[in-house]
């Protein structure tokens, strides 16, 4: 059990974040399933913001883990989250463009003159 699991205020905050974000990951858009409330400004570094509903975003487990893989744990900031969100959105647009281009390529285009 981590130090937050027995913190009733944290549990209420986390549930409210999930509700306010409609149980939807704010990075990839997946809805439902196991979700995690992420502090924009870190839980330990910004204790005055721990339970502020403006200091949280709902993330799926995969996106939450990827954020912390990129930025580590502790001392995280809203700036890091915004940067991560922008990178994720850029990658999503690139993937959509590639998928669209692949879908619109003529079949056997390598055999055309």
Indicate where each model-derived feature is located.
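Short linker/helix segments within small regulatory modules
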Residues: 41-56
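Short Cys/His-centered divalent metal-binding micro-motifs
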Residues: 33, 56-79
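A general structural-boundary detector
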Residues: 4, 12-15, 43-47
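Glycine-rich loops and low-complexity Gly/Arg-rich segments
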Residues: 52, 60-63, 83-86
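Short cysteine-rich loop/turn motifs with clustered Cys
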Residues: 9-36, 60-62
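A boundary/linker detector
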Residues: 1-12, 29-34, 73-113
